[in-house]
UniProtKB/Swiss-Prot annotation:
GO biological process per UniProt: glycerophospholipid biosynthetic process; membrane lipid biosynthetic process
Pfam families named among the record's database cross-references: FAD_oxidored, GGR_cat
Gene Ontology molecular function: any one: geranylgeranyl reductase activity
Manner of cofactor binding, per the entry note: Binds 1 FAD per subunit.
Catalytic activity: a 2,3-bis-O-phytanyl-sn-glycerol 1-phospholipid + 8 oxidized 2[4Fe-4S]-[ferredoxin] = a 2,3-bis-O-(geranylgeranyl)-sn-glycerol 1-phospholipid + 8 reduced 2[4Fe-4S]-[ferredoxin] + 16 H(+); 2,3-bis-O-(phytanyl)-sn-glycerol 1-phosphate + 8 oxidized 2[4Fe-4S]-[ferredoxin] = 2,3-bis-O-(geranylgeranyl)-sn-glycerol 1-phosphate + 8 reduced 2[4Fe-4S]-[ferredoxin] + 16 H(+); a 2,3-bis-O-phytanyl-sn-glycerol 1-phospholipid + 8 A = a 2,3-bis-O-(geranylgeranyl)-sn-glycerol 1-phospholipid + 8 AH2; CDP-2,3-bis-O-(geranylgeranyl)-sn-glycerol + 8 AH2 = CDP-2,3-bis-O-(phytanyl)-sn-glycerol + 8 A
Keywords assigned: FAD, Flavoprotein, Lipid biosynthesis, Lipid metabolism, Oxidoreductase, Phospholipid biosynthesis, Phospholipid metabolism
Superkingdom assignment: Archaea
Comment field (misc): Reduction reaction proceeds via syn addition of hydrogen for double bonds.
Function as written in the Swiss-Prot or TrEMBL entry: Is involved in the reduction of 2,3-digeranylgeranylglycerophospholipids (unsaturated archaeols) into 2,3-diphytanylglycerophospholipids (saturated archaeols) in the biosynthesis of archaeal membrane lipids. Catalyzes the formation of archaetidic acid (2,3-di-O-phytanyl-sn-glyceryl phosphate) from 2,3-di-O-geranylgeranylglyceryl phosphate (DGGGP) via the hydrogenation of each double bond of the isoprenoid chains.
Family note: Belongs to the geranylgeranyl reductase family. DGGGPL reductase subfamily.
InterPro entries linked to this entry: DGGGPL_reductase, FAD/NAD-bd_sf, Geranylgeranyl_Rdtase_fam, Geranylgeranyl_reductase, GGR_cat
Protein name: Digeranylgeranylglycerophospholipid reductase
Chain sites annotated for binding a 2,3-bis-O-(geranylgeranyl)-sn-glycerol 1-phospholipid: 372
Length: 397
């Protein structure tokens, strides 16, 4: 580990890997540090991503694809199902990834591009020069290093502290912080080409339950609930245990994962002098699903490119780096996040009776594409009463 680099990337997930690769491909000296001993472990993700989204960055490889999906099934509180199948999606529903292998592949590509990779290396504090973030104190194997960088890219997830260190408000309201639990469950009867989404205030208050196939008779079975709904006997794991006992009583649990994800609005600003914030660290996970792989990869790649352009011009000020914030915020990603936040706020607090009514009304729907916008418009057409209850939501579509 050297004393100085052009770019320091904190975090070895998909966002950090794409940032490091993009910067290294421009000939910059790049250091990526990951606090955990191994890239991709432990997994803290349901591991789903759309096929078109993935194809923007990497060709699919069977070694890190756990399931190739052709349908998504939405299940209401009373068990009523609405299936969005292959005929409506052009075969583009998505994949369930093996994140341990996938993340390592992305970091390996960054290394091949010229980035230096250091694991079990924790960025514990910023190096501040003239009030600007100018590097980080790194702890690794009992040693402490002070690493300076011209640009720091914070890709260290929902727990990230770099934005706070730079004076950016990173507070997430408890109601918008989903507490999550997930089991890998084996020996269960599932459709191995379908992702299942269970919506019920009773079973998952202000959240949902997912069943994502991971191979033969195996699936990620998880839940996210609002932090304000968690309490003794009502924690995410408690709800999940009750669901599994009901739906998969003979399943064999082989792994437990717990964590949290923000479903709030993005940070007001995702850059500062010498600093770019990407992915979950910037609160860019999807407000409806909590998914963040694509958003992290997109903003990570963009951050690496913007950092390289700024360094070539010799200006890494906040003003110079604002092109990053403006690009994602004013583009398709920013618009989708704003719309999905409005959808989340409108639907998440509905009681089970209204959820059942909506799912029942969807039985005759036909969708030309799988998007949040097309689905919500179809729901409004089938449920005109929603226009009276949710007039503001219509304005976002």
């Amino acid at each position: 580990m050297k004393e100085a680099y052009d770019v320091l990337v904190v975090g070895g997930g998909p966002g950090g890997a794409l940032a490091a690769k993009a910067a290294a491909e421009q000939g910059l000296s790049v250091l990526l540090v990951e606090k955990r001993p191994a890239i991709g472990a432990p997994v803290r993700c349901a591991e789903g991503i759309g096929k078109e989204a993935l194809a923007e960055f990497i060709e699919p490889d069977p070694k890190w694809i756990a399931a190739d999906l052709d349908k998504a099934v939405l299940i209401g509180p009373d068990g009523t199902k609405f299936t969005i199948g292959d005929s409506h999606s052009g075969g583009k529903v998505g994949y369930v990834l093996d994140r341990k292998v996938f993340d390592r592949e992305l970091v390996w590509q960054a290394a091949e591009a010229g980035a230096e990779i250091q694991v079990h290396a924790r960025a514990s504090a910023p190096i501040m020069i003239d009030g600007k973030v100018s590097g980080a104190v790194i702890h690794q194997h009992g040693k402490t290093y002070e690493v300076r960088a011209k640009v720091i890219i914070a890709a260290d997830g929902v727990e990230s502290k770099f934005a706070k260190w730079a004076g950016i408000n990173t507070t997430v309201p408890l109601a918008e912080l989903e507490t999550c639990a997930q089991y890998i469950v084996n020996d269960i009867d599932i459709d191995e080409r379908a992702n299942l989404f269970y919506f019920s205030y009773t079973d998952a208050p202000w959240g949902y339950i997912w069943v994502f196939p991971k191979g033969h008779r195996c699936a990620n079975v998880g839940i996210g609930i609002a932090g304000t709904k968690s309490g003794e006997g009502h924690r995410a794991k408690d709800y999940l245990d009750r669901f599994i006992a009901r739906e998969f009583p003979n399943g064999k649990v082989t792994e437990l994962i717990v964590g949290g994800v923000s479903v709030c609005k993005p940070l007001d600003c995702t850059v500062a002098d010498n600093l770019i914030i990407v992915g979950d660290a910037a609160r860019l996970s999807d407000p409806i699903t909590g998914g963040g792989i694509y958003n992290a990869m997109y903003t990570g790649k963009l951050a690496g490119e913007v950092a390289a352009a700024a360094l070539k011009k010799g200006d890494t000020s906040k003003k110079a780096l604002m092109v990053y914030d403006n690009t994602w915020r004013e583009g398709p990603l920013g618009h989708a996040l704003a719309r999905n936040y409005a959808v989340k706020e409108s639907f998440i607090k509905m009681d089970d009776a209204k959820f059942n009514s909506i799912v029942h009304s969807m039985s005759d729907l036909s969708l030309d594409e799988i998007t949040v916008k097309s689905l919500v418009i179809a729901i409004f057409k089938a449920n005109p009463w929603l226009a009276l209850e949710l007039p503001r939501l219509l304005m976002t579509l």
